[in-house]
UniProtKB/Swiss-Prot annotation:
Protein name per the record: Small ribosomal subunit protein bS20
Gene Ontology CC annotations of this record: cytosol; small ribosomal subunit
Family per similarity comment: Belongs to the bacterial ribosomal protein bS20 family.
Pfam families: Ribosomal_S20p
Keyword annotations from UniProtKB, A to Z: Ribonucleoprotein, Ribosomal protein, RNA-binding, rRNA-binding
Function of the molecule: Binds directly to 16S ribosomal RNA.
Compositionally biased intervals (Basic and acidic residues): 1-21
């Protein structure tokens, strides 16, 4: 437990930031799973590409702002693009 006022404030700030960061990562997880689900269910190519674009946009934003490591963002984008290309070749 914090003993000083400033420590209490830091605890509150930390809790708020932690909650915000978790929400952002959760959004990303949902977007990535959405792309995977659309590919698995053989959805329309345009629908898959739209989901891909939104996921890549979110990855870029979170990587630049350091919510996730930039290399992780790059790796996930690469994995998504490989999945998308394989899906396009399959059709």
């Amino acid at each position: 437990m914090p003993l000083h006022k400033s420590a209490e404030k830091r605890l509150r700030q930390s809790a708020r930031r932690n909650e915000r960061n978790r929400a952002r990562k959760k959004e990303l997880k949902v977007l990535l799973k959405n792309v995977q689900k659309l590919i698995d269910t053989n959805a329309d190519q345009g629908e898959v590409e739209a989901a891909y674009r939104s996921a890549v946009q979110k990855l870029d934003r979170l990587g630049v702002k350091r919510y996730i490591h930039p290399n992780k963002a790059s790796r996930k984008k690469s994995q998504l693009s490989r999945m998308l290309n394989a899906y396009a070749q399959k059709d």
